[in-house]
C-alpha cells in the first residue's frame, strides 16, 4: 500500500461524490491540564444507522488479521502510556505530540473535531512508502513509531488517527480502519471511517476534506479493522 493518492470530493451533475483525485502532498516534557479527557463526542448521537458502506461483514483470518492483532497489542500498551501522560509531569515526545493533536481539537465538537484531527495528522506526517522507510513491502507501525519518524504510508496515518480519535472521546464502536482496493492504480489503500451524528465519514491521508462513505467511488472497500478484529466486507444478500 505504498502509493499515496487522494479520495477527494468531486461534483458531478450537482451531486457530491467521493473519487480518486491524485496525490497531495526529547523525552521528559512537562504536561498540562489541557490533556484532560475530552469526553465521548459521539455517544450522544448513537442511533441505529446503516452499516458502513451499506455492507455486511464476516470475520476473517490471514495476513490482514495478523498485522492488525499485532498493532492492536501495541496500541493498548501505548494507551497506557497516554493515560499516565495525562496525570504525570513527564511523557515521551511521541505521546506528547499525539496528545497535542488531540488537545488542539478540544474546543471543537462532533464533525469539526474529527476534521481537525484528520487535518492535524495529515500535516504532521510525510507520505513515505514502507519500502523507502523500512526496506520492506508492507509494515504496519504503532502510533508512537510513526510520530517519532514523522513518516508513514496510508495505514500508518489511519492508525494514528484511530488512536487520536479514541483519545478525543470517540467510542471504539464508531471507529474502523478500512482497507480499500483502488481501481485507478490497481493497489490497496487504507483510510479511517468515523461515525459522527449517525453518519460514517472517511478520513483520507491526503485529503483534508471529510466525505461520507455513501459518496465514495473509484475504490472498493474490502476489509474493516476495529475492536472486534478483522472482517471482510461484502454486499448484503438480497432476499
Task: Label each region the model flagged.
Residues 2-8, 19-239:
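A structural boundary/capping signal
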Amino acid at each position: 500500500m505504498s502509493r499515496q493518492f487522494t479520495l477527494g470530493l468531486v461534483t458531478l451533475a450537482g451531486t457530491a461524490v467521493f473519487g480518486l483525485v491524485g496525490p497531495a502532498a526529547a523525552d521528559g516534557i512537562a504536561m498540562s491540564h489541557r490533556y484532560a479527557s475530552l469526553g465521548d463526542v459521539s455517544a450522544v448521537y448513537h442511533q441505529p444507522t446503516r452499516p458502513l458502506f451499506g455492507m455486511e461483514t464476516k470475520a476473517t483470518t490471514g495476513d490482514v488479521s495478523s498485522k492488525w492483532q499485532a498493532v492492536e497489542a501495541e496500541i493498548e500498551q501505548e494507551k497506557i502510556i497516554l493515560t499516565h501522560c495525562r496525570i504525570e509531569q513527564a511523557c515521551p515526545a511521541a505521546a506528547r505530540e499525539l496528545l497535542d493533536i488531540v488537545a488542539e481539537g478540544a474546543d471543537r465538537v462532533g464533525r469539526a473535531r474529527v476534521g481537525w484531527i484528520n487535518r492535524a495528522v495529515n500535516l504532521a506526517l510525510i507520505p513515505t512508502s514502507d519500502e523507502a522507510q523500512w526496506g520492506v513491502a508492507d509494515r504496519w507501525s504503532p502510533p508512537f513509531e510513526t510520530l517519532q519518524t514523522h513518516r508513514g504510508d496510508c495505514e500508518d496515518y489511519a492508525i494514528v488517527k484511530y488512536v487520536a480519535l479514541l483519545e478525543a472521546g470517540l467510542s471504539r464502536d464508531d471507529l474502523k480502519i478500512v482497507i480499500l482496493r483502488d481501481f485507478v492504480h490497481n493497489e490497496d489503500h487504507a483510510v479511517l471511517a468515523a461515525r459522527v451524528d449517525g453518519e460514517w465519514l472517511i478520513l483520507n491521508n491526503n485529503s483534508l476534506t471529510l466525505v461520507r462513505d455513501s459518496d465514495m467511488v473509484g475504490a472498493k472497500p474490502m476489509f474493516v479493522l476495529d475492536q472486534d478484529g478483522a472482517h471482510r466486507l461484502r454486499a448484503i444478500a438480497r432476499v
